[in-house]
């Protein structure tokens, strides 16, 4: 370990593993350490089930009815991948897809007036949907056609909207869309957590709805994908990539000290040895004095013996409860997967409800979601602090990731990865460049 590295990475969460993989592909000498004996940090999948009970201090352990403990892989942080989103692009460009198998999530649902409705995924479904009345459907269809045709480089597609100055609120007004449709569009399609976006320029929202539609177009049932055996497979896939390119991995390795000289990182001390480096990447747990708390997320893992009602017996789905429907500032999310994804025993389902904490009684806040899941065999409640770095790392060369938020997709995590990459490398992350390097190594020329 007494060596000189370009980059040392602490923690094997998804953000850290992707950056470690990218840095290795870019020819950097990388040392990657984790104090835990398993991959994934905060974003790991826990197996066997006995381990999950231990983690949540449930000393009696799982009952026989839960089946074999090793049939379970339970994610601590529920997220799906947008089929056309940034993480899937990173997986494809780095060819990490060769280590993973994905399944399409069967449906996306939205909560309205105490009931859940399928988010329409085709025009036929949209016309048959009970989410809106007949005239509303026509207006909504016009709006979707406008979004689909919208091209920020072609003013002919703007229809009087200025992408940089017109607010999204004004765009909704232009198409005369009602409050329920606005809730559903902003939260189930554009995937905003709050309504702050309404008064911001409309371009980002239009692009988010496009991402949803393009992701949906790829596989049809929903825009979301989920890896067999759980999300813990993702960091391991990128860890393999890093190893192919000469990255060194050490699990179960305590970090005693991060060594600084004149305010700049020069190395990491572990078990009496020092590995030197020019740059350091880590998650917030390794540098508590360099991060600030930016809120909390509550996540309740629920084990069920039945599919969720009114989802057409789907073995995987997402439910979004827009904040307006339950008088909150932030949306509540439910991610559900099951034995079909090799993450639970036969006939069992895992549903995870999550939201940004707003009150002193977080468990009460997710009640609308839990009511949809009854009866629940077992609940595991986790309330996590969200941390973000207090500086951009330009002086110290210590680059810290942000905690995983309450959203049910990885787009915010990918933005963090691209942001850290840019601060470290001084240039924006370029997918195409990575792809070329990859092809050189595997000897596969672009067709």
From Swiss-Prot:
One of its GO terms (molecular function) is GTPase activator activity. The modification Phosphoserine is found at residue 427. GO terms for cellular component: axon; cytosol; endoplasmic reticulum; Golgi apparatus; midbody; myelin sheath; neuronal cell body; presynaptic cytosol. It is found in: Cytoplasm; Golgi apparatus, trans-Golgi network. Keywords: Cytoplasm, Golgi apparatus, GTPase activation, Phosphoprotein. It holds the Pfam family GDI. It comes from the Eukaryota. High expression in brain, lower in other tissues. Belongs to the Rab GDI family. Regulates the GDP/GTP exchange reaction of most Rab proteins by inhibiting the dissociation of GDP from them, and the subsequent binding of GTP to them. Promotes the dissociation of GDP-bound Rab proteins from the membrane and inhibits their activation. Promotes the dissociation of RAB1A, RAB3A, RAB5A and RAB10 from membranes. This is Rab GDP dissociation inhibitor alpha.
